[in-house]
């Protein structure tokens, strides 16, 4: 660490008293069973740290007030466990559903209402939406052999990708007039996606 990432090491060293584990120092406060005197800065959690390497995924904020399902294609490392941190959703092998569609399904207000009912409630209006809760969610399957149903899926995916492009454009801080136009386009697309998922919930193909 010190030779490969000297500035990171210097930052960690500046906070040594807060980071040193109990097993390394009597003054330590962290429980990191595998840490040594040489790896005192070691991260405490190991759950799912390598489960989604080189895998596009949705990063889910486990404990949140609003839906948070961020598309990640940059191999961001996440820590998970219980109702802390984040969990991830990836595409199953052989699944016909794009991650963009799953993201739209999870973000839909109907899905969110179900999560509020079945998820654990925490003080301050927070709802836990971890892997166990997500695995129990109802999911209306589409018949991809039926043109109208496949068209709904494909349009949700296309509209989602348009939103990603708009977000990229907005991150470049365009002129206010352009930003307002892009924001309106984004809101229109979000409304369209929500309407399409609402139709699937109603079996209105």
Where are these regions (language model features)?
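Polybasic, glycine- and aromatic-enriched phosphate-binding surface used to engage nucleic acids
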Residues: 1-151
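Non-catalytic DNA-recognition/assembly elements of restriction-modification systems
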Residues: 139-205
């Amino acid at each position: 660490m010190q030779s490969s990432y000297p500035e990171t090491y210097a930052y960690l060293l500046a906070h040594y008293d807060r980071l040193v584990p109990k097993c390394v120092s009597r003054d330590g406060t962290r429980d990191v069973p595998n840490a040594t005197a040489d790896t005192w800065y070691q991260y405490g959690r190991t759950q799912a740290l390598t489960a989604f390497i080189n895998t596009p995924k949705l990063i889910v904020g486990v404990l949140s007030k609003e839906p948070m399902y961020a598309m990640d294609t940059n191999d961001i490392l996440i820590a998970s466990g219980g109702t802390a941190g984040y969990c991830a959703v990836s595409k199953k092998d052989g699944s016909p559903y794009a991650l963009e569609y799953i993201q739209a399904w999870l973000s839909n207000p109907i899905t969110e209402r179900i999560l509020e009912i079945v998820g654990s409630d925490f003080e301050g209006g927070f709802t836990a939406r971890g892997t166990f809760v997500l695995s129990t969610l109802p999911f209306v399957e589409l018949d991809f052999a039926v043109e109208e149903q496949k068209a709904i899926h494909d349009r949700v995916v296309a509209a989602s990708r348009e939103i990603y492009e708009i977000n990229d454009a907005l991150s470049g801080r365009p002129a206010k007039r352009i930003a307002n136009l892009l924001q309106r386009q984004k809101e229109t697309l979000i409304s369209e996606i929500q309407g399409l998922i609402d139709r699937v919930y109603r079996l209105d193909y």
